[in-house]
């Protein structure tokens, strides 16, 4: 948090409720400093979406943590998702998808650099889906062995050109803060700070920096006020559940700046 605060940024932290020590004091401290705390699955075992019955049971437990933590945001471990089942969660938004990422265990991508809305079959319940639009730090630095921020910079510039949303997922446990030899998956935190500095310096005064909950609130207002929207078209790049929801007209894609944000 110190690193981001020094550069004028804030972010959201998502914690796995079971199997990890997540104290109320830690969550309160995060929120008190202007950051956000959300729920990251139930356990980090890759089994959350194995069966609909199993998810239904686990969703009850997840909702308990959402209420206890006073959180309205959810993130699935390993970016696994079923956007229809997630409607069982009492959330305002979810961040379990990505615009494009061939290195994730679940196939299919969303193919857009904008948030969108998922509606229940009755049309009353909905949540905002906020896909990440920049490669994860683990993919770039730990898996692919990149040593510069060139990929981030190139993608960010493309997003800006198309008036889209820059959403980056990082893992602080991979940050190497002292440049000493750590575990093999660590990378210098300077790569992250250099990217934040690039954003701040090149695009000063040109971006709206908010927490995910604020982004979700913005798009929720658009949903309830029947703001201008564009329906997504089913595509082979999407997972089967996403294609089904689109065909049922339960997915609404927003383009608030009137630009073409499809990849």
Task: Identify the function of each model-found stretch.
Residues 64-164, 252, 257:
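Active-site-adjacent pocket scaffolds in enzyme catalytic domains
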Residues 10-12, 34-38, 73, 92-93, ...:
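Structural preference for beta-strand elements that scaffold enzyme active sites
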Residues 1-8, 20-40, 119-125, 155-164:
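Acidic (Asp/Glu)-rich catalytic clusters
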Residues 13-17, 39-43, 75-78, 95-97, ...:
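A cross-domain feature marking catalytic cores of carbohydrate-active enzymes
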Residues 4-11, 149-262:
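C-terminal domain-boundary segment and adjacent tail
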């Amino acid at each position: 948090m110190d690193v981001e605060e020094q550069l004028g940024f804030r972010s959201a932290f998502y914690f796995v409720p079971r199997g990890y020590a997540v104290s109320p004091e830690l969550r309160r401290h995060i929120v008190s400093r202007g950051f956000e705390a959300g729920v990251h699955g139930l356990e980090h075992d890759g089994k959350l979406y194995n069966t609909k019955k199993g998810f239904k049971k686990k969703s009850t437990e997840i909702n308990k943590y959402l209420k206890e933590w006073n959180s309205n945001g959810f993130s699935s471990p390993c970016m696994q998702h079923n956007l229809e089942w997630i409607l069982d969660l009492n959330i305002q938004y979810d961040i379990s998808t990505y615009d494009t990422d061939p290195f994730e265990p679940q196939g299919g991508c969303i193919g857009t650099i904008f948030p969108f809305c998922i509606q229940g079959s009755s049309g009353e319940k909905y949540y905002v889906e906020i896909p990440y639009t920049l490669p994860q730090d683990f993919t770039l630095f730990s898996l692919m062995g990149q040593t510069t921020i060139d990929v981030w910079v190139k993608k960010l510039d493309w997003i800006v050109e198309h008036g889209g949303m820059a959403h980056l997922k990082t893992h602080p446990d991979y940050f190497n803060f002292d440049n000493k030899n750590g575990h093999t998956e660590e990378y210098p935190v300077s790569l992250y700070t250099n990217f934040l500095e690039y954003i701040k310096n090149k695009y000063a005064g040109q971006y709206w920096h908010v927490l995910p909950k604020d982004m979700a609130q913005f798009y929720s207002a658009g949903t309830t006020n029947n703001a201008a929207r564009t329906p997504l078209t089913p595509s082979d790049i999407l997972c089967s559940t996403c294609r089904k929801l689109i065909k049922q007209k339960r997915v609404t894609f927003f383009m608030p700046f009137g630009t073409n944000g499809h990849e």
